[in-house]
Amino acid sequence: MSEKRKDNRGRILRTGESQRKDGIYQYRYADILGTRRYIYDADLNKLREKEKYVQKQLDQGLDYANGKMTVVELYEQYVDTKRNARENTKKTYAYFAKVLRNDAFSKKEISKVKPLDAKKWLIKLHDSGLSYGTLKVLKAAVGGAFKMACEEDIISKNPCAFSLSSIISNDTTKKEVLSLEQQKAFLSFVRKDAWGSKYYDVIIVLLNTGMRIGELSGLIIDDIDFEKRRIKIDHQLQYYDKNGYVVEKVKSRSGNRMIPMSDDVYESLKRVLNNRKQIEREFEDYVFLNRNGRPITSTAFAISLKRIITKYNNCHQNDQLPNITPHSFRHMFCSNMVKANMNAKTLQYIMGHADISMTLNVYSHIDYDAVEKSMLDILNADN
């Protein structure tokens, strides 16, 4: 019978345990893949507590060694699997990595992160000034990383599997839109304004198609069928300081669609193509160009739109318009169609939404007058 291994204090060591010359205790085990692993501690009793935890993880089929990686290390591994993401999404991932690194939460071992830890972290970020909308996207990204860890059997539960609204009030304000009367007044002003009139057709197309500004920027002549009066949407054009113009896919498969042309849109597109002057050869197929012959960008148009709104408000002291963005026209289009009782599935298709709840809950801005008219038109139809 072999002699039991003992430490320098005469205590019997268990299978897998040993003591190094420097007095540190170590425990050797095989992980779920059969790879040899070690854990260490200067105190034998504390080492045995670690052994129990390791064994519990192994019994559950979890990877203890990878469970010791930190939150930010897990997040970086998760982001590395998203190499096909759009440039905007990559920039968002990079920003969130920076937010993570600036907080002690990022250094916690993922196997030790509890839902309470994640909740406290998000509340702390909200108190520091991050908006509910930003935190919602951040939680989805970090939660996605923890979900990946669950799928890889590194941890058993996702500590971010809770609703953000359960810990933080949704203080997101609805995007500003113009009423139908304001839309008419604004379009009339833009059409007559010496400087703003060059954006009239851009606004007409956005307001009457519901397309995104990136989709409008990316329109090429072949996307427009004047005979059948329809516009093909299957890509968008973005501009990045680092990469310049980048053609990207639409946001989802549902984003591939055909949008019918109204008479106003038909006339605006004809006018835009007939009035093009200076055109860079590289961009000759694009429809909406700036004065330098290059495709318009969302940033440049947003700046110009703000200038037009300011000019309008200076001329209409008693009828001020809210600050709107290029994307506001998409919201207005959706609201206008809902008020006109367009079929919900038809509107979902035109908007390019994968989920109809996005069409009805986020983009439609219905006021009481519209609700009253819709209801009474139905109830009084037979009177």
Predicted segments, located by residue:
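Short amphipathic helical patch at the helix-1/turn junction of helix-turn-helix
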Residues: 126, 140, 206-208, 338-339
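DNA/chromatin major-groove-contacting recognition/catalytic segments
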Residues: 186, 242-248, 340, 361, ...
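Basic, Lys/Arg- and aromatic-enriched nucleic-acid-binding interface segment
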Residues: 23, 136, 151, 155, ...
